[in-house]
């Protein structure tokens, strides 16, 4: 295992980072993005009405993915201000009586949990950009605060958002200190960002396109790809909050990185174009991994798509024989 692939080691940073809830604009932007993108139950990677995606569960061990935060270290964060603590204490005094079971997420207003989830997504991406993984203590202190009993629910939902929208897995890299890191999904090693560029990973968009290509028979016309992306709020030529200008990203950046091939459809007049998996996508991930992602979006299982499952299984068997 290379040094870059080793799990980040949890240590303390003497320069404490403060992440204040005064960043309400960023939280609002994240909340808006979550509403408009992949978590919609109508996300149409394949035809037909879709079910809600199932709750995330531990996946069977695969190869260790390339970390988006390749040199992360842990950090202890401070609370935003004494006034926040006072506000929190006041909220506790104003909270429902102890006789009410507030540990059940169903007894908490949906908008309150949604705000915590959106804020946690924003917080985790911020820590990742700072090359610092996330500790449970950080999340409880800065994000969850008086909602500790709902920690598991909030973390689960934030993890699903990071997975489906940004193409990132939340991994507990140190069970002793409950230290977490964000890792690119499906074995991919490119986050869709140029070197030194500030922003968030664009891997989620790449995974969608790879999924559309596979589900359409290993080649998808440009019209088919944009039909899916349009329904997730991503439009050609229109800057997207997360993905920037998506057409440039898909037809130039992903092609340059050899994740996609973009070519003219044979004998088309007027010229039409199509997408195929590029050599880097074929080398780093597999049809089965992509199918598992598609199935999760649909709230089903890989074998629910018989032809694609048979094709993916055949590829797995061929790769296994090649390793012998």
From Swiss-Prot:
Biased composition (Acidic residues): 82-95
Compositional bias ranges of the Low complexity kind: 70-81
Protein name: Melanoma-associated antigen B16
GO BP annotations listed: negative regulation of transcription by RNA polymerase II
Basic and acidic residues bias locations: 1-15
InterPro entries noted in UniProt: MAGE, MAGE_N, MAGE_WH1, MAGE_WH2, MHD_dom
Gene Ontology CC: nucleus
Pfam family membership, one: MAGE_N
Organism: Homo sapiens (Human)
Keywords noted in UniProt: Tumor antigen
Domain MAGE: 113-312
Taxonomic lineage of the native organism: Eukaryota, Metazoa, Chordata, Craniata, Vertebrata
Region annotation (Disordered) ranges: 1-22, 39-108
